[in-house]
Amino acid sequence: MKNEKINILNLTQEELTELLVSLGLKKFYGKEVFIWLHKKITRSFDEMTNLSLKDREILKEKTYIPFFNLLKYQVSKIDKTEKFLFELEDGGTIETVLLRHKDSKNKEIRNTLCVSSQVGCPVKCSFCATGQSGYMRNLSVSEILNQIYTVERRLRKKGENLNNLVFMGMGEPLLNIDNLSKALSIISNENGINISKRKITISTSGVVSGIEKILLDKIPIELAISLHSAINEKRDKIIPINKNFPLEDLSAVLIEYQKQTKRRITFEYILIDNFNISETDANALADFIHQFDHVVNLIPYNEVEGAEHTRPSVKKINKFYIYLKNVRKVNVTLRQEKGSDIDGACGQLRQRNKKGDN
């Protein structure tokens, strides 16, 4: 049965080599099979033609290559954003989003993939569709990789590739740091898809222990903080994990992060009407982030069914933006919406699928 076989996509090149040797295959096949799995992204042992038929049969008998079932697919008519709803082996579902944009010269298409790290999310941010849908479990290494590989295979058919990865999909990446770290080592392997860790961004709600592990393991990724308020009392209300990792602790670990990495930190700030867009909120935000080399990304709230929050008017959004930029001299951007004509907010497509909506 499949569940008695080894999921071969979960293994690093070193682990794969050890497995193949234990199965009686030659040691150098470790690199060859790794290339088939992670660079060529094959989904069949039969395609591994530089292995003998006998060795391929051994792999079929003892291991398997997992793949996703695509439940739903949406593409934006406005900006060509693509959204995928995948079904996992145990019936769980996750979302992955492909963001397509022109480069600075407005010529070549750049492809950024927004990747999920968990089935649901335990953080339960009040503004997030994923948080409303509950939490099931962490994604395995292969489930993280398969999001990337499934989309990369589609792009290759059009002569394109993935350029950047952002772990801003479903789940809190730093609560799945072990599997995420292992997946990153495979992704950045020169014998694999070989996406540099410097082109990978991890977005976190502020899991201080996870940021500490990034520093300890010297994982050279870009970091984005889902801040959304620089006032503890307010942040507690919308991001419950702030009670465990308050702003003072977050600030301390980010100071150390920037000291060690010399990298700019992105702060994401969802604009919620009548909650976090006053001048007091703007000043608190500016005071908090001015100690860092930073960019603040303002995100107008994408309304979620069942959530109590609402989106501010364009006038209020612009007032907040201009005050930060011109008065407080914050390095701030206003996010250009992607996929606004499809289920754009994280978790919305999954939520609709659960309800049986089309």
From Swiss-Prot:
Cofactors demanded by this protein: [4Fe-4S] cluster
Enzyme class: transferase
Organism of derivation: Fusobacterium nucleatum subsp. nucleatum (strain ATCC 25586 / DSM 15643 / BCRC 10681 / CIP 101130 / JCM 8532 / KCTC 2640 / LMG 13131 / VPI 4355)
UniProt xrefs under PANTHER family: 23S RRNA METHYLTRANSFERASE, RADICAL SAM CORE DOMAIN-CONTAINING PROTEIN
GO cellular component terms listed in the entry, alphabetical order: cytoplasm
E.C. number(s) listed in UniProt: 2.1.1.192
Residues spanning the signal sequence: none
Miscellaneous comment text of the record: Reaction proceeds by a ping-pong mechanism involving intermediate methylation of a conserved cysteine residue.
Protein name as it appears in the record: Probable dual-specificity RNA methyltransferase RlmN
GO MF assignments: 4 iron, 4 sulfur cluster binding; metal ion binding; rRNA (adenine(2503)-C2-)-methyltransferase activity; rRNA binding; tRNA (adenine(37)-C2)-methyltransferase activity; tRNA binding
